[in-house]
Amino acid sequence: MLEELSAALKAFLDDLAAAKLADRVLVLCFSEFGRRVQENGSGTDHGTAGPVYLAGPGVKAGLVGEAPKLLDLQDGDLKMTTDFRRVYASVLEDWLGLPSKPSLSGDFTKLPLFRG
């Protein structure tokens, strides 16, 4: 599945670059559910924590946040290491130029997600 996502994102970003629109677009990809560590008979069950991917020429390359520890679980789930609202606050304020507090109902520390 990740190979298909990668190919689709590359094609999309290549098309944006060809149209000279890539600098205006941010791709944010996430799932509403994570995966549990323990396998069952058909794979793994839905969990509570999962990754968020950002793509586009304005995004700083690299990983942000701390990887969850596979042996330090909370009721069988990975522990969240970065609150998704920190990602949203960063996108709202640093990419869209909007205040994040009204949308997120609180203040969340932004993450260094974007190039200068």
Language model feature labels by segment:
Residues 1-116:
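Feature marks hydrolase-like catalytic cores characterized by long aromatic- and Gly/Pro-rich stretches
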